[in-house]
């Protein structure tokens, strides 16, 4: 969860910009559907420090606190089992998608030879990038599902 928060913040906000120019609207649009935090605004300390790391640390703390609150809602249930089930389902779905994507890549990689590039190297590089994208998507989807899971009693 902490890594998901950090990835989104660093993707949207640059340390090179002053805090007044940070795109908090984009950060809210990226992060809030995954982690249901309150609307993200800068504190005075974050404005004065100008460090993205301070914002990341605060958002990570809020995320952990929010998840601990979620754990209290599930006292009667085995939350670790729910986490395991969600993670396995997400991994299974993303892995199957990844296998399909790799098959499509293999079918189309021959065109790289026309561009004077080694198809094996291009396949390896594209496959590595696709695998990294898959692992990031697994983290995001699992985090989002854990925060939005609800147990209905019959």
Give residue ranges: language-model regions.
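Extended, charged helical/alpha-beta scaffold domains that provide interaction surfaces
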Residues: 1-154
């Amino acid at each position: 969860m902490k890594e998901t928060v950090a990835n989104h913040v660093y993707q949207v906000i640059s340390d090179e910009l002053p805090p007044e120019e940070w795109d908090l609207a984009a950060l809210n649009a990226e992060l809030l559907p995954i982690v249901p935090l309150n609307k993200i605004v800068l504190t005075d300390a974050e404005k004065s420090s100008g460090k993205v790391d301070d914002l990341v640390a605060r958002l990570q703390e809020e995320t952990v606190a929010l998840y601990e609150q979620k754990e209290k809602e599930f006292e009667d249930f085995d939350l670790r089992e729910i986490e395991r089930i969600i993670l396995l389902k997400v991994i299974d779905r993303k892995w199957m998608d990844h296998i399909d994507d790799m098959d499509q890549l293999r079918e189309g990689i021959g065109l790289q030879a026309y561009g004077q590039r080694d198809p094996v190297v291009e396949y390896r590089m594209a496959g590595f990038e696709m695998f990294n994208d898959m692992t990031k998507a697994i983290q995001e989807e699992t985090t989002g599902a854990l925060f939005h899971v609800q147990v209905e009693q019959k």
